[in-house]
């Protein structure tokens, strides 16, 4: 029994670390967002997520930034486990790029929007690495024996759509986005795309953990049947 459990140690690292990244990230974002607004409404989505880490006007900025540090670290550990479990080239690319995403999330917690120049660089790194990561996930889905689920594929497509919108709106000279329209402040494409990318990545982490958990149970059941 000990040897069987040990065989799945790295799988369990992926399960727990990816779920932890999603839970911690969701808690930090939700608590900072609720503390910033007077009431829960659709207008919450017009607030850029990175503004929640501003120490000058966000009362829960510390919680938000610490959650980025913790969730990014958890996701990085999950990707280290992916790199060591799956030896094929595509999975290794996913692990490396996922590691870059994790590091960029950590750096966004270390350098929130108050450190504007550094924050712009690390947030651009997050955007680009997320785009490349989900592009490779699309390829991985059609690989024989892939553990990528349809839900993960759907979330990757959503992330790509949101990411490409942000990429088109990005001012490369400043590595930042233009302010929302003063005429139609209720329709801020930048904020909506940021929230869409953020939530898709969080749910992608959840699906990754649940997918590996299902794989463990299936393989264990097959092993017991053989015995």
Predicted regions and their residues:
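Terminal transmembrane helical module of multi-pass membrane proteins
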Residues: 137-227
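Internal transmembrane alpha-helix with an interfacial aromatic "cap," most often the third helix
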Residues: 4, 66-97, 137-145, 209
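Interfacial helix-start motif at the membrane-water boundary
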Residues: 50-73
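Membrane-proximal helix-loop-helix units in multi-pass membrane proteins
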Residues: 97-148
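Hydrophobic cores of alpha-helical transmembrane segments in multi-pass inner/ER membrane proteins
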Residues: 22, 67-77, 128-137, 196-211
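Short, Lys/Arg-rich, polar N-terminal cytosolic tail immediately upstream
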Residues: 1-10
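C-terminal ends of transmembrane alpha-helices
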Residues: 27-34, 103-117, 162-182
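N-terminal signal-anchor transmembrane alpha helix
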Residues: 9-37
């Amino acid at each position: 029994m000990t040897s069987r459990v040990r065989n799945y140690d790295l799988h369990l690292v992926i399960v727990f670390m990816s779920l932890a990244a999603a839970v911690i990230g969701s808690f930090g974002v939700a608590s900072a967002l609720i503390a910033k607004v007077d009431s829960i409404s659709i207008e919450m989505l017009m607030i850029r997520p990175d503004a929640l880490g501003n120490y000058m006007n966000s009362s829960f900025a510390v919680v938000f930034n610490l959650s980025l540090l913790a969730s990014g670290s958890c996701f990085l550990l999950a990707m280290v486990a992916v790199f060591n479990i799956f030896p094929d080239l595509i999975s290794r690319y996913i692990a490396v790029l996922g590691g870059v995403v994790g590091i960029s999330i950590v750096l966004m917690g270390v350098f929130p929007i108050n450190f504007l120049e550094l924050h712009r660089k690390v947030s651009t790194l997050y955007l680009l690495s997320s785009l490349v990561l989900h592009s490779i996930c699309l390829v991985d889905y059609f690989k024989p024996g892939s553990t990528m689920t349809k839900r993960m594929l759907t979330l990757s497509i959503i992330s790509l759509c949101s990411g490409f919108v942000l990429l088109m709106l990005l001012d490369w000279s400043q590595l930042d986005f233009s302010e929302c329209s003063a005429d139609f402040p209720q329709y801020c494409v930048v904020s909506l795309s940021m929230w869409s990318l953020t939530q898709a990545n969080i749910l992608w982490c959840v699906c990754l953990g649940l997918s590996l958990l299902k794989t463990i149970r299936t393989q264990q059941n097959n092993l017991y049947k053989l015995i």
